[in-house]
């Protein structure tokens, strides 16, 4: 079974996605739900499909994903990263176009911590001169 399946782990913000690529017809299953029912936002669905559309493998694979943590945007980004890594494991020649599109690099931006004496990470209380 391992010969017919490719795996990739994707991360974004606090979300982690485990992605399995199997030969198929283009079904995308996330946490045992379809892509359309899992993501209400069209932008999130579009982000998930980006690496497949770039490599023209949309109808070639069935994708099974388990994703935990984060919110809608983080989970979509994590799935995209995982699909990219699984595609590279499937065919190393896809690395170059995926790298050019910026899908291979893990987006390292994280939420900045809240500081003591501030309302948020950088928002300060109003300053009064007198």
Curated annotation (Swiss-Prot):
The keyword Ribonucleoprotein applies. Belongs to the universal ribosomal protein uS9 family. One of its GO terms (biological process) is translation. PROSITE patterns: RIBOSOMAL_S9. GO terms for cellular component: cytosolic small ribosomal subunit. Gene3D superfamilies: 3.30.230.10. The keyword Cell cycle does not apply. Keywords: Ribonucleoprotein, Ribosomal protein. GO terms for molecular function: RNA binding; structural constituent of ribosome. Pfam families: Ribosomal_S9. HAMAP family: Ribosomal_uS9_B (MF_00532_B). SUPFAM superfamilies: Ribosomal protein S5 domain 2-like. PANTHER family: RIBOSOMAL PROTEIN S9, SMALL RIBOSOMAL SUBUNIT PROTEIN US9M. This is Small ribosomal subunit protein uS9.
């Amino acid at each position: 079974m391992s010969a017919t399946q490719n795996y990739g782990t994707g991360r974004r913000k606090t979300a982690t996605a485990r992605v399995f690529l199997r030969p198929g017809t283009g079904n995308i299953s996330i946490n045992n739900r379809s892509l359309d029912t899992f993501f209400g936002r069209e932008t999130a669905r579009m982000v998930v499909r980006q690496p497949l559309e770039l490599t023209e493998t949309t109808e070639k694979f069935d994708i099974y994903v388990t994703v935990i943590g984060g919110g809608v945007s983080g989970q979509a980004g994590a799935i995209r990263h995982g699909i990219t890594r699984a595609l590279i494991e499937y065919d190393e020649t896809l690395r170059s176009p995926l790298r050019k599109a910026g899908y291979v690099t893990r987006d390292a931006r994280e939420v900045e911590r809240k500081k003591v004496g501030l309302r948020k990470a950088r928002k300060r209380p109003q300053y009064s001169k007198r």
